[in-house]
Design a protein with these regions (language model features):
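Proteolytic processing hotspots in large secreted/extracellular or virion-associated proteins
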Residues: 346, 387-418
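Short beta-strand elements
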Residues: 328-352
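Bacterial N-terminal signal peptides
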Residues: 6-17
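Short edge beta-strand/loop segments characteristic of extracellular beta-sandwich folds
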Residues: 229-233, 374, 415-417
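Exoplasmic/lumenal beta-rich domain surfaces
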Residues: 95-130, 197, 207-217, 244, ...
């Protein structure tokens, strides 16, 4: 009997400690409660954002705070990337990162200066485990700045899993006041054939019926595979900056076909941002999340069935429900129907267009330039039409490869310098 009670108490103790570890709250890295200009998982031009960007009011030199008792594990000084950056390890298996700093506190700055002299190098990327530079929660460790690849003064802050080095959503560890769900800006449907070709993207008109529920009507689509795109963004209290969506799910006739929860990212996957966003809309400053695509299954925050596609048979109707949420659980919902009509017509290429199959190696030729593509370089078949433009003032010719509106994904561009 006592053995059973002891085992029960041990189990409760372990469960209790595990809950504490998962709900460990950190201090904010700036005094008071700073405003966000960028959040975790946000769609950037070339990558998914792996941290939070805190506003500093256009100023440099604000004290940066140690968010939890820890030790300096790494220091980096660079003209690019995070610029002057600190990495602190903490109990509980997490590492915090502070980027674009203007300077370090004297205890750290003295060590960094000695390393620079010894290596005869301004740029430093040093393991600091032997220096035992420990700080308590609330201590000032550095000052905010604009170093590295920064577009203006701000603090970039990350939380990482120390063992896997995956980036974790810092808002899981910070107390956030937010009472408004994500905004719904638009809904798009992409009808896809077996080859990967599609009809021009169709926008679904939806109306806010109250309580953040948006309803659309019955949308006629070619029978076959249909992908859903959601134009959405989020805001936090007292900030005008558009932020990325935390949670997004799609259900077809009650069955979940896509689910995204931005809690964790692997750095070797952040380049897949162009599989998660509609690039054509992004160029027009619209954030449209694509909830379909075979490559999406590689992203840690994403889970999908059948590539996230909705199967619509001829003369059938499919009920679609889309749920969006922020990390505080504030939600918005979209509901509409897809009605299957005639299948897609056979693809016809216009002059100058070429169909690139994703599973085959191929090449594009235009004037004196050739672009070679390896097999699987593209997520889906793409119809492209390369064009060459010249800028005489800097002797640069640019080859831009555009999709023609007949395919799922846009092409890419590359430059050739003379």
């Amino acid at each position: 009997m006592w053995r059973g009670i002891g085992a029960l108490l041990l189990m409760l103790l372990l469960l209790s400690s595990n809950v504490c570890a998962q709900t460990d709250t950190l201090l904010y890295p700036l005094k008071n409660v700073p405003l966000l200009s960028g959040n975790f998982g946000e769609l950037r031009a070339t990558h998914l954002h792996t941290g939070l960007d805190f506003k500093t009011g256009g100023r440099e030199g604000l004290p940066v705070i140690c968010v939890k008792d820890g030790v300096v594990a790494r220091v980096k000084v660079s003209a690019t990337g995070y610029g002057n950056a600190l990495y602190l390890e903490h109990e509980g298996g997490i590492t915090t990162v502070y980027g674009h700093l203007s300077r370090f506190v004297p205890r750290i700055a003295k060590v960094v200066r000695n390393i620079q002299y010894n290596k005869e190098s301004f740029e430093v990327d040093e393991n600091m485990s032997g220096y035992e530079l420990r700080f308590r929660a609330g201590d000032t460790i550095a000052y905010s700045g604009n170093t590295g690849s920064s577009g203006g003064p701000h603090l970039h802050f990350e939380v990482r899993d120390t063992k896997s080095e995956h980036a974790l959503n810092p808002l899981q560890f910070l107390s956030v006041k937010d009472q408004t769900g994500p905004n719904v800006r638009g809904v798009y449907v992409y009808s896809v054939s077996d080859e990967g070709t599609r009809t021009p993207v169709r926008r679904v008109e939806v109306k806010n019926t109250g309580n953040r529920v948006f309803r659309g009507g019955k949308v006629g689509v070619p029978a076959g595979m249909v992908g859903i795109g959601i134009q959405s963004d989020d805001y936090m209290k007292d900030s005008w900056n558009k932020l990325g969506v935390y949670g997004l799910s799609v259900r077809a006739n009650g069955q979940e076909v896509f689910k995204m929860t931005m809690n964790e990212l692997s750095f070797d996957q952040t380049f897949l941002v162009n599989e998660l966003k509609d690039f054509h809309h992004y160029r027009e400053n619209r954030l449209v999340y694509l909830t379909f695509g075979n490559y999406l299954g590689q992203l840690l925050p994403v889970r999908n069935q059948n590539g996230g596609f909705v199967s619509v048979e001829k003369d059938s109707v499919v009920d679609v429900a889309v749920d969006l949420s922020d990390i505080n659980g504030n939600c918005s919902r979209i509901m509409f129907q897809l009605w299957g009509k005639s299948p897609l017509r056979e693809l016809v290429l216009a002059d100058g267009e070429k169909l690139l199959m994703n599973h085959q190696s191929d090449s594009l030729k235009k004037e004196k330039y050739t672009l070679w593509l390896e097999a699987d370089a593209l997520p889906y078949p793409v119809v492209c039409k390369p064009e060459v433009s010249s800028r005489l003032r800097d002797s640069v010719e640019t080859i831009e490869v555009f999709s023609t509106g007949k395919q799922i994904y846009p092409g890419t561009g590359f430059c050739v310098d003379h």
